[in-house]
Amino acid sequence: MEYLLQVKIAALVGLLFLTLIFGFIPARVKWFRDTDGTETHRTVLSLISCFAGGVFLSACFLDIIPDYLSDINTELHARQLETSFPLPEFIMAAGFFTVLILERIVLNCKEMRATHEERTTLIPERKSGHGHGHGDGPDPESSGHHVHVDFQAHSPFRSFMLFLSLSLHSIFEGLAIGLQTTDPKVVEICIAILVHKSIIVFSLAVKLVQSAIPPLWVAAYIGVFALMSPVGIAIGISVMEAQLAAGPLIQAILEGFAAGTFVYITFLEILPHELNSPGKQLLKVLFLLLGFSIMAALSFLG
């Protein structure tokens, strides 16, 4: 048992440092943060982002949802909770709608604040006698749609929810290591998670850099995300020691919320933003498939 604990601690440290390395490449390299580059630069960034979208799509369908459904069904059968109601899917939908409602609240507050600031700006202009139109000035009605779309595409809230859902999933991946009882299984799962998480954190960092999040917060997100799998390993070790009866069921329910959150972020944030932007459509789809295929191959081999 002592040697098994040492193996788990080594896995904890390895996951932490490798995640930090791959996460800080997009965050610290100026090339990824340059939004005023050449057309070629913007195209390459867009293709990298499409690749990341394929990674997240694969993570959604081939990793997060299957893991959740397997865990929740195992727990329901173990507790002999038989029902015709699709409870696993309902829990996932609850996570989806939780993010949807929270985002609508945030957007509504932002729009109300923007409207208030607009009125505050217009009143002094009218008092100073500048009520006539300016032909060269921006038209609020015509530009509002574009501002709205851009905000939606790079919403810091959505980036945070992407970070949160991936962080929760990382905790559960760490739990899978912490709950193992044999050395070979710990090493096997750890290697699979190392490869998987390196690609995921790189893709997450690309998305965070492209959003309206300050660099310091991007670094904080990556640092916290890197800690999630080690935290999961520590929790798994603690659960094994404490032998909590309800632990696996609580884990499965939280996985369902994380899966629903991830479905929302993948299909309402990442894919629409990448595929609706103009230019190189077939090449974007190709890179989307490439990201998906690489993760699918890793899942197949793992």
Curated annotation (Swiss-Prot):
Which tissues is this chain's protein expressed in? Answer: Highest levels in ovary, lower levels in intestine and gill, barely detected in kidney.
Cytoplasmic face residues: 28-44, 102-158, 207-216, 273-281
Q: How does it sit in the membrane?
A: Multi-pass membrane protein
**Extracellular face of the membrane:** 1-6, 66-80, 180-185, 238-251
Offer an example of a GO molecular function term for this protein.
Answer: zinc ion transmembrane transporter activity
The protein's location, in the record's own words, is:
Cell membrane; Endoplasmic reticulum membrane
Does this entry carry the keyword Repeat?
Answer: no
The UniProt catalytic activity note for this protein reads: Zn(2+)(in) = Zn(2+)(out)
The processes (GO biological process) annotated in the record are:
zinc ion transmembrane transport
- A single Gene Ontology CC term: endoplasmic reticulum membrane
| InterPro entries from the UniProt entry | ZIP
What is the predominant subcellular site recorded for this chain? membrane
Q: Does the keyword Lipid biosynthesis apply?
A: no
Q: Which keywords does this chain's UniProt record carry? A: Cell membrane, Endoplasmic reticulum, Ion transport, Membrane, Transmembrane, Transmembrane helix, Transport, Zinc, Zinc transport
Q: Where is this region: Disordered?
A: 123-145
TM annotation in the entry: 7-27, 45-65, 81-101, 159-179, 186-206, 217-237, 252-272, 282-302
Q: What family does the database annotate?
A: Belongs to the ZIP transporter (TC 2.A.5) family.
Explain the purpose of this protein. Transporter for the divalent cation Zn(2+). Mediates the influx of Zn(2+) into cells from extracellular space.
Q: What is this protein called?
A: Zinc transporter ZIP1
Species assigned in the record = Takifugu rubripes (Japanese pufferfish)
> Gene name, please?
slc39a1
